[in-house]
Amino acid sequence: MADLKRTQPLARDAMAYVLAGGRGSRLKELTDRRAKPAVYFGGKTRIIDFALSNALNSGIRRLGVATQYKAHSLIRHLQRGWNFLRPERNESFDILPASQRVSETQWYEGTADAVYQNIDIIEAYGPEYMVILAGDHIYKMDYEMMLRQHVDANADVTVGCLEVPRMEATGFGVMHVDAKDNIIAFVEKPADPPGIPGNPDFALASMGIYVFKTKFLMEQLRRDAAEPGSSRDFGKDIIPYIVQHGKAIAHRFTKSCVRSTAENEAYWRDVGTVDAYWEANIDLTDITPELDLYDRDWPIWTYAELKPPAKFVHDEDGRRGSAVSSLVSGDCIVSGATLKKSLIFTGARINSYSTLEEVVMLPDVHVGRNAKLKRVVIDHGVRIPEGLVVGEDPALDAKRFRVSEKGICLITQDMINKLGL
C-alpha cells in the first residue's frame, strides 16, 4: 500500500494558496485601479491566471486566492473565469479577502498572516499539503514535481528557486545551500549573495513558492502569530525560522518548469516594472517566443468573453488594415491602420492612417486617425486623439506621459485628458 501511494499524484492531496494582495507600485498607473495580479497580460489573460493554471494543470483541485489591495477587478475576473471547480468532485475555489477572521486587524499584515487569517477554512478542507504561491509572476511550472521532492526528502519546507547570475540576485531572497540543496541560510536581498556550490557565479533566488505539510504549516503560523516582534511574513519570518530549527530544501525551477521543447530556456518573469511588463508582452510577438501560449498540453486558463473575431478593413495604398508580427485579440477592428510587432487586447478600434509599432494595448482602447505610436503601453479604455504622435520626441513625451527608464511611454486616460485635445 505504501508503494502504491508513492505512485499516486500528490497534487490531489494538496491545496494551492495564491497570495494576490500586492499592489505592484513599480507598475505605476497600471495598478492605480487594480492589484498587480489583476493586470492584463498576453492579449487575453491576467497575471494571476499563470499561477492558477499551473496549479490546475499540475492536478491540484483545491485553490484559494487571498486578495487585498483594490481587489474588485481581480475578484470579478476570478468569479467569471474560475468558477468551474465543483465541490461534488472534491474541488474548491475560494476568494479570501481580508475580513478580520481571527483579529480586529482590517488588513493582512504580511504574506504569512494572509494564510493564518484563513486557517479555519484550510483546516476544514483538510489538505495534506499546502503549496503557497505568489500571484504576480509569469511562468509555467508543474508543482507535482516540487511536491514529490518535498515528500521524498521528508522536508519541513521546500522553497522554489531560480538560478540567477549572482550579482543580479541582490533584489531577491537568496538561499545559501549545500551540495545537496539543503538550505543552510536564507538571506533577504543580500549585498553579496552566496553562490551555488559548484557554480559560484550564480545564486539561488526565491520564487516565493513554498511547499509544506499542512499540519506543520499551521503549527508554524500559530507560533509566528504569537511572536510580538514578527512581521508575519514568509520570507522574513517563517522560512528563516524553519531553516534554523528544521529541514528546508531548495527546489530548482529547472526541474519542474514546463517547456514546449527541450531546447527552450526555463521561462520566468517578474513583470513588476513598466519596462519588464512591456518587454514580456512584446516578446510574445516573436516567431518562436520563449513563452508558448499555444501549448495545448499546458493551457493558460482564463475568463473568455463571448466576442466576435478581429476584423481588418480597407485595402488602399496608405490605408490598408494590416498587422505584421502582432497578436490581435477578438472584437478588434483595424480600419486602414498598420500594426507592427504589437499586442492588442480585446475591443480595440484603430482608425485609418494610424501606425502602431511595439505597442501593448489593453482592452477597449480607441485610436483616432493619423496617430503614430511607438514603444508604448496604453491602459484600459483610453481614447487616443486624432493625430497624436508618441515615441518620436522623448523630451515631449516625458512632459505629457509616464516615461520609463528604457523609454517606454505609459499612457492613461487621465494623461490624455490633461492634453486638452
Swiss-Prot record:
InterPro entries: ADP-Glc_PPase, ADP_Glu_pyroP_CS, GlgC_bac, GlmU/GlgC-like_hexapep, NTP_transferase_dom, Nucleotide-diphossugar_trans, Trimer_LpxA-like_sf. It comes from Mesorhizobium japonicum (strain LMG 29417 / CECT 9101 / MAFF 303099). It holds the Pfam family Hexapep_GlmU. CDD domains: ADP_Glucose_PP, LbH_G1P_AT_C. Homotetramer. Belongs to the bacterial/plant glucose-1-phosphate adenylyltransferase family. One of its GO terms (biological process) is glycogen biosynthetic process. Involved in the biosynthesis of ADP-glucose, a building block required for the elongation reactions to produce glycogen. Catalyzes the reaction between ATP and alpha-D-glucose 1-phosphate (G1P) to produce pyrophosphate and ADP-Glc. Pathway: Glycan biosynthesis; glycogen biosynthesis. It catalyses: alpha-D-glucose 1-phosphate + ATP + H(+) = ADP-alpha-D-glucose + diphosphate. This is Glucose-1-phosphate adenylyltransferase. GO terms for molecular function: ATP binding; glucose-1-phosphate adenylyltransferase activity. Its EC number is 2.7.7.27. Keywords: ATP-binding, Carbohydrate metabolism, Glycogen biosynthesis, Glycogen metabolism, Nucleotide-binding, Nucleotidyltransferase, Transferase. Alpha-D-glucose 1-phosphate binds at residues 108, 173, 188-189, 206.
